[in-house]
Design a protein with these regions (language model features):
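Predominantly five- to eight-bladed beta-propeller fold
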Residues: 24-35, 81-82, 162-222, 250-253, ...
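Active-site-proximal cap/loop segments of hydrolase catalytic domains
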Residues: 514, 519, 527-723
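Conserved beta-propeller blade repeats
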Residues: 52-66, 98-116, 135, 142-157, ...
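Beta-strand-rich domains and repeat architectures in extracellular enzymes and scaffolds
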Residues: 46-82
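Short glycine/acidic-enriched loop and turn motifs that connect beta-strands
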Residues: 72-76, 119-122, 164-167, 254-257, ...
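Cap/lid segment of the alpha/beta-hydrolase catalytic domain
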Residues: 255, 440, 449-572, 579, ...
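Short loop/turn segments that connect beta-strands within beta-propeller blades
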Residues: 88-92, 129-133, 207-210, 271-275, ...
Length: 723
């Protein structure tokens, strides 16, 4: 459930994937850049939703011109729309070239921009000149195009279409067209927020170089698999060889229970000339060992092989410029979605693999090859910040940046120039050029999408605070202070509980869990990098699996107790808030906080871990983190501890008001968890409230729902912490 890392990985290096429109008829809606209201002087839910959100970014090969998409939301119509911009970095001039498009990339040596648009009713590939002229639809596929990737010679294009190849859910009976029931025969019948009635497939189409992309042929014809992988994969999971003769692609070729319990995806090489496929991860004679599906794979034979067979997540391939090598991100162990992501390099000349980031004791996010074929740039989190790095093929890693922010690598322009996006707890994403000189990266901001917000609103300071844990270790916490903070006053404070549970508390900007809007409401926020978070070594990361309520919970309490030593913190007005595993944390703390807190808010959290095992869809996750199914009786230690310390077992000790929030389309953690917690609280006479969203998943994506979320959030906190 490592959602933040998954989203960072989905920030495409060279490809495109369609942004899901907000609203059923969003394809025809034009939303202009909204006019923000700064009268309050501080960030509000309405002003937060008025900010532009920078999406896909691309540069010409010389780095002189960039194109990027910005999504704007209209609160009244409850819809969003993306506008494509071009900026000349030599003249510093920016102009909009298309309203209603997204995922722009340069084609034809930087003279035109290809992108996705639904302007004519279905999602198709369009092209427009960099001056905004001659916009035209260049694909006319029968199905929506969900993503596209041009070959280097631009004679072919990969188009992503959904195909109706899933037999887990039976098709409707012809004489019952209005029947809504689904006959389900196996796992995985649902994923994230959708029932699995179709799968994305790559189609290879011809491009005439001017105005027409052909219909395309299914590269995985007849195969019941996904490419890209659901629910978050885009065309970063495919790559063209430099000679345009081969395609590398990511695929997890499994079905049923095996699909639901295994993370073993591989990198395959497809030859266009003879239509043959080779698995680059495993030898041709590899046979997957049998497994017990209801037990953790940690100690099973699939993870005990002496030969390197890449049995974990392998994805996002990229060829070196000369075509000799291909690199991809690789996890070592099957069933462990939060394993460290390494860079694996395959040498076509020798047929050997090597791992070139072994000395970096954290995960690789986005990456890109240097033009010299001997170095790779990448981003990765360390000590609560995501920086840019470079490694050579011998595994010598150099850190290039050291800024208080999170970078995401977009494109390697040259050995000395990188294109990146950058955000922090004080700033939303903007585009930067990073100049690399003498093993150091110097960042230069090139977009200023939300400058008026930063100039016209007051912002709180963000400071690092190291806290001693109960076992004598050091825990990094971010502390966010209200604007115009006055140390002579006393402020209510919030403990922010991170989700994942293996997602970093880095310098992230969120349009929902936004630290600045909490600070703008005069709360001090402490956000701990508790046990289980990446960026502090593998031991720290792995101390949470099988122990959800041990040291990680003590880390939370150590953080808030340490903050309460400050005279400006009112320890009689403390709250705890969090989503996903953070919601689990809140539910557990509600029965174990020893009267520290006066208010709780849990969003999409797990209330009953036994219930969670049989309700969630990606079963590899509870198998690994909870150590097995709840009915398994062998290996009793960690497994029984995971279920024996479920939050619902402490509800008799609940004594504090709690707000339970959940989306009813959340298949990762079902909304029945919130209903159960809310019912238990009310039956015990505890002041409680529940906010349900029938049309939202694990996140809240619609403008009016987002504002309702924020208003309800602060009304609840203010009721109990600002008396």
């Amino acid at each position: 459930m490592n959602f933040k890392i998954m989203l960072m990985s989905a920030a495409l290096m060279t490809g495109t994937m369609q942004i899901h429109a907000q609203g059923s008829d969003a394809a025809t809606v034009v939303v202009e850049k909204p006019r923000a209201d700064f009268s309050s002087g501080r960030l509000t839910p309405e002003s937060l939703w008025s900010m532009g959100r920078i999406g896909n970014v691309s540069s010409t090969t010389d780095g002189k011109v960039i194109t990027y998409a910005v999504t704007y939301y209209d609160i009244k119509s409850n819809k969003g729309n993306s506008v494509i911009y071009v900026k000349d970095l030599q003249t510093d001039k920016t102009h909009a070239i298309f309203n209603g498009g997204n995922s722009p990339v340069f084609i034809k040596n930087g003279k035109e921009i290809a992108f996705l648009s639904s302007r004519n009713g279905s999602s198709q590939v369009w092209s427009v000149g960099i001056n905004g002229k001659n916009a035209r639809q260049i694909s006319h596929a029968q199905k929506d195009v969900e993503g596209f990737l041009f070959s280097p010679d631009e004679k072919k294009v990969i188009l992503i279409h959904s195909v109706d190849n899933n037999t887990v859910i039976e098709k409707k009976e012809n004489d019952l067209p209005l029947a809504t029931g689904m006959v389900i025969n196996d796992l995985m019948y649902k994923h994230w927020d959708q029932y699995n009635t179709s799968s994305p497939h790559p189609f290879i189409a011809d491009f005439d170089g001017a105005s027409n992309i052909s219909e395309g042929t299914d590269m995985l014809e007849g195969e019941p698999f996904e490419c890209p992988m659901l629910p978050f994969g885009g065309v970063e999971q495919l790559a063209w060889s430099p000679d345009s003769k081969s395609i590398a692609y990511t695929c997890r070729k499994k079905v049923g229970k095996e699909y639901a319990t295994s993370t073993d995806s591989d990198i395959f090489l497809y030859d266009l000339s003879n239509k043959t496929t080779k698995n680059l991860c495993k030898p041709s004679n590899y046979a997957a060992p049998s497994v017990i599906y209801t037990k953790t794979l940690q100690d099973q034979s699939v993870n005990k092989t002496e030969t390197d067979c890449n049995v974990g997540y392998d994805q996002n391939p990229q060829f070196s410029p000369n075509g000799r090598y291909i690199a991809w991100t690789s996890m070592e162990r099957d069933g462990y979605e939060s394993d460290r992501t390494r860079l694996c390099v395959y040498d076509f000349k020798t047929g050997t693999k090597s791992y070139v980031t072994e000395v970096f004791e954290s995960g690789v996010n986005e990456f890109g090859w240097d033009a010299d074929n001997n170095h790779i740039f990448f981003s990765g989190v360390w000590h609560g910040q995501t920086q840019l790095y470079r490694t050579d093929l011998k595994g010598h890693v150099k850190q290039l940046t050291n800024d208080t922010c999170d970078y995401s690598l977009v494109q390697v322009i040259s050995s000395k120039l990188l294109l990146a996006k950058r955000q922090s707890m004080q700033r939303a994403d903007e585009v930067y050029l990073v100049n690399v000189r003498k093993d150091k990266g110097f960042a230069h901001q090139v977009t200023f999408e939300n400058k008026n917000f930063y100039d016209n609103l007051e912002w709180g300071d963000v400071k690092a605070r190291w806290v001693k844990t109960v076992d004598g270790k050091q825990e990094l916490c971010w502390v966010i202070y209200p604007p115009k903070f006055d140390a002579s006053k006393k402020y209510p404070a919030l403990l922010f509980c991170e989700g994942g549970p293996q997602s970093p508390v880095s310098q992230f900007w969120s349009f929902r869990w936004n630290m600045q809007i909490m600070a703008a409401n005069d709360y001090i926020v402490i956000a701990p990098n508790r046990r289980g978070l990446p960026g502090f070594g593998m031991e720290w990361l792995e101390e949470i699996s099988g122990d959800y309520t041990g040291l990680c919970m003590q880390d939370y309490l150590s953080a808030i107790d340490d903050l309460c030593k400050e005279t400006y913190v009112d320890k009689e007005r403390l709250g705890a808030v969090g989503a996903s595993f953070g919601g689990f944390s809140v539910y557990w703390l509600a029965g174990n906080h020893n009267k520290r807190f006066k208010a709780f808010i849990a969003h999409d959290g797990i209330y009953n871990t036994q219930q969670q095992y049989v309700e969630t869809e990606e079963l590899w996750f509870p198998n690994w983190d909870l150590k097995s199914a709840p009915w398994e009786k062998t290996g009793a230690g960690e497994m029984q501890k995971a279920y024996a310390t479920s939050p619902h077992l402490y509800v008799d000790k609940w004594d504090t008001p709690i707000l339970c929030i959940h989306g009813q389309k959340d298949f990762r953690i079902e909304y029945t968890q919130a209903e159960s917690a809310f019912t238990a609280a009310r039956m015990r006479g505890i002041d409680a409230q529940m906010l349900l969203f029938p049309d939202e998943n694990h996140w809240v994506l619609k403008p009016q729902n987002g504002i309702l979320w924020q208003r309800t959030f602060f009304r609840w906190l203010n009721k109990y912490l600002k008396k």
